[in-house]
Amino acid sequence: MSITIADDIRDWSINVLEVSNPDLPGGMSACPFARKAWLDDQVRIVECEDVLMQTILECGHFDPDQASLVICASYNLPDATELYDWTSAMNAFASKADIHVMSFHPDFGAEEAELDFLYLNEWQSSLEEPYCMMFIQSLSQVDDASLLLEDKGYYSVYPEDEYHELVIERRKRRNGYETS
């Protein structure tokens, strides 16, 4: 039986995102909400050829009551800089529909962002070929979760520029840029 991208993502979540992490305050996990989302069957993974087109399609019918997280994943890698720019543009548009999109590209990741807690681990992908991912979630749900994490000091390990880009800018989009 061959391993799918979905299998690999689930393995990554179990072994990296859901486990206690000594680099985070109080040993929190890298993604404190991941385990519950999986247990509640709130994660849907779509393996596709064109990750950008599939993300647009998934955003068009995204329903957080059906799945709080949709992951579009593909072996067909767009250029890393283009993916980053596309994600920023998509969020400017999608925020009006309470949708937030995050991207992962194997050529640009946690190491460049100095997010040690995401890459200093023993996990290895079971797949030989790299893949990219687009994460689709409710903007308000992600922002509400980040408020809870802020209270617990979660973002204290983030470099200031990453915190601003990942948390503050997202919050500004949610609030129509009324948040300073």
Q: Residue spans of the language-model regions?
A:
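Expand to "…catalyze enediolate/carbanion chemistry for C-C bond making/breaking, isomerization
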Residues: 1-180
